[in-house]
Amino acid sequence: MKEYLDLLNLILKNGYPKIDRTKTGTLSMFGYQIRINLNEGFPLLTTKYCHFKSIVYELLWFLRGDTNISFLKKNNISIWNKWADKNGNLGPIYGKQWRAWEDKKNNTIDQIEIALNKLKKEPSSRRILVSSWNVGELDLMSIPPCHVLFQLYVINNKLSCQVYQRSCDIFLGLPFNIGSYALLTHIFANQCDLLVEDLIWTGGDIHLYKNHLNQAKLQLTRSPLPLPKIFIKKKPKNLFNYAFNDFLLIDYNHHPKIKAPISI
């Protein structure tokens, strides 16, 4: 994806040195937008290997409303291990907020179900939003949400999604986040018999950790390859019944993996 490489190059050249919570140090910039036409292929980075299995299982985990890593560990996904407590709990992170946001009357609100119903019954609505940024529960989370909000938009029977990410690790996180929200858009479209259109990613504090500089420079020496395609094999009776094997990634050709440490 040239759009991603352009942002990576921009932050290498113009990013401001900034001390961060992890004490690793970053090059940082504020505010940027990428628009990806999902009809041109599934936006999984080709200039390094991205683990599609982790993207799928994490998204299915979110959609289950789960906040314990046991489901991920059962499927050999370790991406959340370092943030979990000794019992595997992460507090009321994404899954809890998406599926069971608590109101002041102690009722729970299923934002995903509401969004799905609006897409089916009122696709022109400007209120098809899902938020993870529950101010009243931030201090109970192992880490506050990085991608905090997404909005769905339908025109001419085509579905677009815009996501706002307050904090973005551009080297390790962003390729994963783009893949995840692209897949989520395809899932909503599949459930609602819509076509897909655009994924719009909007970033707040976008940062390249200083222990990722050499990896970023290596990646910029590589030329993007044609994007893969995504095929959803069936339409389950509801959005929460998808399984990993329902998704087929076709023709994912990529450059070799580039290892980089995670800052916690």
UniProtKB/Swiss-Prot annotation:
GO CC terms: cytosol
EC class: transferase
Keywords, comma-separated and alphabetical: Cytoplasm, Methyltransferase, Nucleotide biosynthesis, Transferase
Protein's pathway: Pyrimidine metabolism; dTTP biosynthesis
Localization per Swiss-Prot or TrEMBL: Cytoplasm
One example of a Gene Ontology biological process annotation: dTTP biosynthetic process
UniProt-listed Pfam families: Thymidylat_synt
Highest taxon above the source species: Bacteria
Reactions catalysed: dUMP + (6R)-5,10-methylene-5,6,7,8-tetrahydrofolate = 7,8-dihydrofolate + dTMP
EC number(s) on file: 2.1.1.45
Residues that bind (6R)-5,10-methylene-5,6,7,8-tetrahydrofolate: H51, D169, S263
Entry GO MF terms: thymidylate synthase activity
Keyword Transferase assigned: yes
InterPro entries: Thymidate_synth/dCMP_Mease, Thymidate_synth/dCMP_Mease_dom, Thymidate_synth/dCMP_Mease_sf, Thymidylate_synthase, Thymidylate_synthase_AS
Active site: C146 (nucleophile)
Residues annotated as binding dUMP: R21, R126, R127, R166, S167, C168, D169, N177, H207, L208, Y209
Main location: cytoplasm
UniProt feature coiled coil, ranges: none
Family per similarity comment: Belongs to the thymidylate synthase family. Bacterial-type ThyA subfamily.
Database matches in PANTHER family: THYMIDYLATE SYNTHASE, THYMIDYLATE SYNTHASE 1
Assembly and interaction partners: Homodimer.
Biological function: Catalyzes the reductive methylation of 2'-deoxyuridine-5'-monophosphate (dUMP) to 2'-deoxythymidine-5'-monophosphate (dTMP) while utilizing 5,10-methylenetetrahydrofolate (mTHF) as the methyl donor and reductant in the reaction, yielding dihydrofolate (DHF) as a by-product. This enzymatic reaction provides an intracellular de novo source of dTMP, an essential precursor for DNA biosynthesis.
Name of the featured protein: Thymidylate synthase
Organism: Wigglesworthia glossinidia brevipalpis
